[in-house]
Amino acid sequence: MPKHGKKYLEQAKLVDRDQVLEAREAMDMVKKLATAKFDETVEVAFRLGVDPRHADQMIRGAVVLPHGTGKSRKVAVFAKGDKAKEAEAAGADAVGAEDLVEKIQGGWLDFDVAVATPDVMGLVGKLGRLLGPKGLMPNPKTGTVTFDVARAIQEIKAGKIEYRVDKTGIIHAPIGKASFDVQKLLENYQTLLDTLIKAKPAAAKGQYIKSITLSSTMSPGVRVNPLKPHALLVQQ
């Protein structure tokens, strides 16, 4: 059981763990609880009615949040020739092929997302043991294995996030910063929620979205009503 600091415990007293709020109320609460000296990240956790041990219930993908996450992301691109030039022009932070593979094998990992063109995936495969555990391996399901490198880079820089259900059936994702206004956070939240609803596996039975919890980096979680997935953005 992790130990929490005095400030967290004081904040926890303000949150009724049995109370389930509408999304706007929950977002207001999270913003009030985000009192750290840095701009805390607002995160959401969806507990889904899936069993990720079965391949047909694994949920993984990516979505561009309309207002981004508030965090700048460094992009490394594995590509050759014209595609390498295209990546550089699009604002990639590192571009290469064999040379980039060697650099990473040497311990360099100063990037947040990796993109690769399909023709160099044989090379990138050598980095599986290094990049895989860190969630940095390019993957067609998240749009990071593509010949359209310019678009991939632009989407990532604009606020594209990847999501993946963990072994307990939960998806954790950042949806912005505490400094964002509530409406922007809600629109990011709604975009991700709509994406997950569309991604519901046919094999998933029973209630799909079992619970939703919002929190900031340092705050306790605030529960959101999972039975009202739409009409969440109406101004109060």
Curated annotation (Swiss-Prot):
Single GO cellular component term: large ribosomal subunit
Gene3D superfamilies, per the entry: 3.30.190.20, 3.40.50.790
Keyword RNA-binding applies: yes
Example GO molecular function: tRNA binding
CDD domains: Ribosomal_L1
Keywords: Repressor, Ribonucleoprotein, Ribosomal protein, RNA-binding, rRNA-binding, Translation regulation, tRNA-binding
Keyword Repressor attached: yes
Subunit comment: Part of the 50S ribosomal subunit.
Protein's job: Binds directly to 23S rRNA. The L1 stalk is quite mobile in the ribosome, and is involved in E site tRNA release. Protein L1 is also a translational repressor protein, it controls the translation of the L11 operon by binding to its mRNA.
SUPFAM superfamilies: Ribosomal protein L1
Family: Belongs to the universal ribosomal protein uL1 family.
InterPro entries: Ribosom_uL1_bac-type, Ribosomal_uL1, Ribosomal_uL1-like, Ribosomal_uL1/biogenesis, Ribosomal_uL1_3-a/b-sand, Ribosomal_uL1_CS
BP-aspect Gene Ontology terms: regulation of translation; translation
Protein name according to UniProt: Large ribosomal subunit protein uL1
